Every structure is written in C-alpha cells, then in structure tokens.
C-alpha cells in the first residue's frame, strides 16, 4: 500500500481543482498526494493504469465535464470489481435533487454542492478526511 493517501480531484476547472486541494491541505498536509484530472475519460485511464502503489484512497468528482462526464465515470467505477471500493465524493456546483439522486443511484458515497466560501470548503474537506482518510501512522 502507498505511503501516502492519493486523492484524485476530477474537475475540468483548474481553479476549482486547486481550491479543493488547498482546502484539504489547510489542515491535512501530511500523507496526502493530490492528483488533478480533467475529465472522466482521463480518470478511468488513470485507474486502469494505476498499480497498488498509485491506487487512490478517494476520488472527488465533478459531474459536468467535457468528454466522459462525472455520471458516466461514476457508473463505470462502481460497476468495476477493481474500483468500486474507492470512496467517491461527487463535488459539484449542482444543487439539483435529480443530480443528487442519480449520483447516489450510481454509487456515490457522498454528494456535496460546492460551497460559496473557502471556510465552508475547509469544513467539508475536514469531514471527508475524518470519514474516509484516517491518519496513517
């Protein structure tokens, strides 16, 4: 198993990816590696090519992206024997009940609407870390 937890941040918006990473890093700098991925196609390619050392501990996934969107990628991840165990958090600007229900139906572990302040984002990422990424000793 990897020395660090790998967190895949899948979002087509570079600014959003960096903000999410910064929120995680605000209180959880140790034992985390952040890998930015731009869309669902590249996410699935990463997962297929990853060995045990590079397997992610968590996927943060936007829904609306060019190419294979988050819904399609989530469906493929959760249908895969190899990847379905990876906690997947849908993290999107959508606050639609339909998007939330579809995400859960596809196997998302959590659905979060992107907050409007950095402090709220830090609170959310702290909760995610406590739930799915315990400190490694």
Where are these regions (language model features)?
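Receiver (REC) domain active-site loop signature in two-component systems and cognate sites
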Residues: 65
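Active-site residues of response regulator receiver
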Residues: 61-62, 92
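Acidic, metal-coordinating helix/loop segments flanking the phosphotransfer/catalytic sites
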Residues: 36-58, 122
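Conserved active-site segment of CheY-like receiver
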Residues: 12, 91-95, 115
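C-terminal output helix
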Residues: 42, 116-127
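Conserved acidic segment of CheY-like receiver
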Residues: 4-24, 59
